[in-house]
Amino acid sequence: MEKMSFGEIFQSIFTPLMIELGVLWQTNSISPSHEHFITSLIKQKIHSLCEKLQESQPTNLDKTYVLYLPDNEIHELGLLYLNYEILFRGYKTIFLGQSVPTASLSNFLEKYEKMVFVSCFTIEPNNDRVEEYLDDFEQEVLAGEGSELWITGYQVQHITNHKNPKIRIFKSSADLIKEL
């Protein structure tokens, strides 16, 4: 493990662990507190690494990443990890976290020229409301030039191609990271 990067550890150890914990939780083999405890430990590590990365000034200034979860979405571990990966590559990030109303995101457009909004749709918006959410996001946030929305997560796996080129759907966090 000493020779593995944090990204390699997250992808090869933490991600499979979290999937297994989810299965154990759904089958009542463990309680929610067990899953929350492990998640909390991983979050602490990611926060610590992000704090260290933010001690240095960003080196890639061509865009700013705003990471958020949509209303009623609370599963932020994947988003925290994406924040780490983006910071690791020298970009400026603004991490907003859980349950952020779409309307509040347009405020950032006044301060930054090129924004990439990043989100993970794990449980919200649910499958039958994703397209409506994307249409609303397009009208409320992406109407101007220079901004994009990058999404990954379970709820967008069924979308093969979105009509707006400013909205990019990734099958996995690893695919999103490759685009950084």
Predicted regions and their residues:
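C-terminal regulatory/effector modules of DNA-binding transcriptional regulators
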Residues: 31, 37-180
